[in-house]
Regions:
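Conserved FAD/dinucleotide-binding core of flavoprotein oxidoreductases
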Residues: 220
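Amphipathic alpha-helical interaction motifs in eukaryotic regulatory proteins
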Residues: 69, 229-232, 248, 299
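Conserved C-terminal subdomain of P-loop nucleotide-binding cores
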Residues: 172, 176-184, 232-237, 243, ...
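Short, surface-exposed acidic
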Residues: 78, 236-246, 256, 310-313
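PAPS-dependent sulfotransferase catalytic domain
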Residues: 2-4, 11-215, 225, 261, ...
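Short acidic/His-enriched helical or mixed secondary-structure segments at domain edges of catalytic enzymes
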Residues: 249-273
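A generic structural motif
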Residues: 81-87, 242-249
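Non-catalytic, well-ordered alpha-helical segments in soluble enzyme domains
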Residues: 72-74, 224-239
Length: 321
């Protein structure tokens, strides 16, 4: 399995450098859990300028939705990233309702997914932005997210008549055990979401396609303006000079947290509302909890499951030259 993955990455790189016609990814399987259903993308009517925002989860999804929304819509104040950028593969919302909302959008659409590449219908016409983050930061953020679910949020997933797989629960353990479970099984206890390593490597293998851009949480934190300009260039969006201060302000965590606290849905689904959903937006909270050996174990697992360049990027955000 691992050898095949690495070979696929090398082959994609070789083809890209040779200037050959891209070999577009093909869907080969479905992923269906209590949370997501990949079949909801089957037959999706793509537009030529669609944007798909892709993450494993808790890696900066909503932040990137906010950034893309500011760029696409011209830096409006008070937009709801979740409202303007639906999560198509999320099971609880009726598919016809989501598709109808997308069809009615007159602007360039930006759609969210958490699916692995081999479970997603891929369009050569769309542009894909993949966001990554250090696995340890993802685990800490996922724990906080899952612990904040209200009873209504849990019922939204668990009471579906066609629910697939285990029920969604709050974390059944402390964050340290949660981390150990992730390293052992590559999933989150009580929150079946698929495997991070497979998800990241699969998308990494197609990073050389002309319609795929990789963005890292660390880079956004260290130099948000530079990364937003890189995203704008990739999306071929020209931004007026006077809009930049407003875009940067409205993509800050303080702004997004304050805006989220005004969204009634956040209070319904997260204890503490938008403040819980966005929490701190910081990295490295695990450093005060884990031992050096426990910290290093994540790197050891990544080295086994990922190619070296992919493992380095996921941890640091450094792309190969």
């Amino acid at each position: 399995m691992k050898k095949k993955t690495k070979k696929g990455a090398a082959k994609a790189t070789k083809q890209s450098r040779a200037g050959k016609k891209p070999r577009w990814p093909q869907k080969t399987r479905d992923v269906r859990t209590a949370i997501v259903d990949s079949t909801r993308w089957n037959g999706f009517p793509f537009r030529d300028d669609d944007i798909v925002i892709v993450t494993f989860g808790k890696a900066g999804t909503t932040w990137t939705q906010q950034i893309v929304g500011q760029l696409v819509l011209g830096a409006p104040e008070g937009i709801s990233a979740a409202g303007a950028s639906p999560w198509l593969d999320m099971r609880p919302f009726p598919l016809e309702q989501v598709l109808g909302a997308l069809e009615a959008q007159p602007h360039r659409r930006f759609i969210k997914t958490h699916l692995p590449i081999d479970a997603l219908v891929f369009s050569p016409k769309a542009k894909y932005i993949y966001i990554g983050r250090d696995a340890r930061d993802i685990v800490w953020s996922a724990y906080n997210h899952q612990a904040g679910f209200t009873d209504k949020a849990l019922a939204m997933f668990n009471d579906l008549p066609d629910r697939v797989g285990p029920k969604v629960t709050r974390p059944p353990c402390d964050v340290r055990e949660y981390y150990q479970h992730f390293l052992e099984f590559d999933d989150f206890p009580g929150f079946e979401f698929g495997g991070l390593w497979e998800h990241t490597q699969g998308w990494w293998n197609i990073r050389h396609l002309p319609n795929v851009l990789f963005v890292h949480f660390n880079k956004l934190k260290a130099g948000m303006e530079l990364e937003i300009r890189r995203i704008a260039h990739f999306l071929e969006i020209d931004v007026d000079r006077e809009q930049w201060p407003r875009i940067l302000e409205q993509c800050s965590f303080d702004y997004m947290r304050a805006a989220a606290q005004k969204v009634e849905m956040m209070d319904e689904f997260f204890q503490g509302g938008g403040g819980t959903f966005f929490h701190k937006g910081t990295n490295g909270r695990w450093k005060d909890v884990l031992t050096p050996e426990e910290i290093a174990r994540c790197d050891e697992v990544a080295a086994r499951r990922l190619t070296p360049d992919c493992a380095r990027w996921l941890k640091t955000g450094r792309l190969p030259r």
